[in-house]
UniProtKB/Swiss-Prot annotation:
Gene Ontology MF terms: large ribosomal subunit rRNA binding; structural constituent of ribosome
Family indicated by similarity: Belongs to the universal ribosomal protein uL11 family.
Subunit composition and interactions: Part of the ribosomal stalk of the 50S ribosomal subunit. Interacts with L10 and the large rRNA to form the base of the stalk. L10 forms an elongated spine to which L12 dimers bind in a sequential fashion forming a multimeric L10(L12)X complex.
NCBIfam families reported for this sequence: L11_bact (TIGR01632)
Post-translational modification note: One or more lysine residues are methylated.
Gene3D superfamilies linked: Ribosomal protein L11, C-terminal domain, Ribosomal protein L11/L12, N-terminal domain
InterPro entries: Ribosomal_uL11, Ribosomal_uL11_bac-typ, Ribosomal_uL11_C, Ribosomal_uL11_C_sf, Ribosomal_uL11_N, Ribosomal_uL11_N_sf
Keyword Transcription listed: no
Name of the molecule in the record: Large ribosomal subunit protein uL11
Keyword flag Iron: no
Organism: Gamma-proteobacterium EBAC31A08
Amino acid sequence: MAKKVANILKLQIPAGGANPSPPVGPALGQVGVNIMDFCNAFNAETQSAEKGMPLPVVITVYEDKSFTFVVKTPPAAVLIRKILGIAKGSGEPNREKVGKLTRAQLEDIAKQKEPDLNSNDIDAAVLIIAGTARSMGVEVDL
C-alpha cells in the first residue's frame, strides 16, 4: 500500500547549503520532518552542483513523517544573470536593457533546463527562456 501524502513543500535552497536555520528549518519543522536528515540528504545530493546556486526542491512529506524530495534545475533567471555577469535584471525592462543573449547562449540554458520545462523540443524551450530574458530587460538575438 502506498504511503499517504500529508504535505508538499516547495523551497529554493542554495546547492550544498541546506541548514536548520530559516527558511529551511521552520518550513520543515511545521510539518514534523527531521530537519537534519533532510539537510544531510539534500547537501549530499547537491554536492556536485555549483556551490551556492539556488535550486528549487519539492519535498513530499508523508503521514508517518518520512519524506522524499526532488531537486530541480536552477531558475532560468539565475542562469541568465550568471551568463551575463549581472546582479539583477532591469527595473524597466521595456526601456532599459541590461545585456544581450545570443541564440547559442539561449540554447545552452534551454538544454540545461529541459527536464523541468514544459516543451516538446529545444526550439520551444529556447522561446520560453527568451521570454524570461526579455522580462528581465535582456535583449534577445533569435
